[in-house]
Amino acid sequence: MSTPVSLAQSHSCRVDTHAHVFERGLPLTDSRRYAPGYDATLDTYLQLLNTHDIGRAVLVQPSFLGTDNRYLLQALSQDTHRLRGVAVVAPDASEEALAELHRQGVTGIRLNLIEQSLPDLGAKSWTPLLERLSRLGWHVELHRNAQDLAPMLDRLLEAGLPVVVDHFGRPDPEKGIHDPGFKTLLGYGGTGRVWVKVSGAYRCAVPGSGFVHEATSQLVEHFGAERLMWGSDWPHTQYEQVMNYGQSLSTLLELGLDAAMVDAILCTTPALFYGFEQRTNHAVAKYGQYEGEKRTGQPHDHEVRRCDART
């Protein structure tokens, strides 16, 4: 991995909560659904952030790399001030291994279960991991078709874990907001423990439909803007020909939401959730701040409170 350019050119409060970085030649998991035939490097990604005035970002472990988080951690190490990570781990991941990920800027794990067998999160084999995640103050990011979300959400909430649901909850593109699974997801807005990413709409919407506007309106109604977060889904794997970074950002900015809502979705909520502004959970006492924060202190607290995300 080359040294990325312009690591901290942008001081915007905006946060991109969903992007992937990878290169050809990395070891791939046997259970992969696909593998891109191109590079999506941190260098390229940071240039996009700077171009679009995005100050911070969350790198999500690509599904095709499985539980080998080395490339993700290498990317995070390039700018611990600006980047956070979401890893993929095995159910038997040790407390020591998770603590090391925590120190390197990881804030949660992703369960990418698209086209995968559903795990029994209530099984004894999962209990130790869920308890360890809770002690760290981590969240679980859930990626699954809307119709299958409810049982997993119930178990994760029962374990006391915050949950982030990917890509509008992945309703069936043919059903959109009428997908019963999406309607069920709306009911979790009252828990105060579930967040939804308004991202990757092209994965769950018929082109040209009004899905993004309709779904976002319903999510705001049931969750509040303070439980929604935007992600670019860069590099838009399998949809590279129909989407780019600027279009992804415009999808949110052109919805006609008021300034306070956009500020919550794009700035305030993700800044707090991913620990860019401050880490208030009990994990700090046991494991400390991220390595970068130990050196530099908390970045840009005042900017989170002042920004107008639309500009």
Enumerate the predicted regions with their spans.
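Conserved, mostly hydrophobic/aromatic
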Residues: 18, 49, 72, 101, ...
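Active-site gating/metal-coordination segments in enzymes
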Residues: 66-147, 197, 201-202
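Catalytic pocket-lining loop regions of alpha/beta-barrel enzymes
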Residues: 122-229, 278
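Active-site environment of divalent metal-dependent phosphoester hydrolases
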Residues: 22-25, 64-67, 92-93, 116-117, ...
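Alpha-helical scaffold segments that flank or form the walls of functional sites
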Residues: 31-60, 65-79, 99
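Mid-to-C-terminal alpha-helical segments outside catalytic/metal-binding sites
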Residues: 2-13, 38-56, 218, 224-229, ...
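Hydrophobic faces of well-ordered beta-strands that scaffold small-molecule active sites
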Residues: 15-19, 57-60, 83-87, 109-111, ...
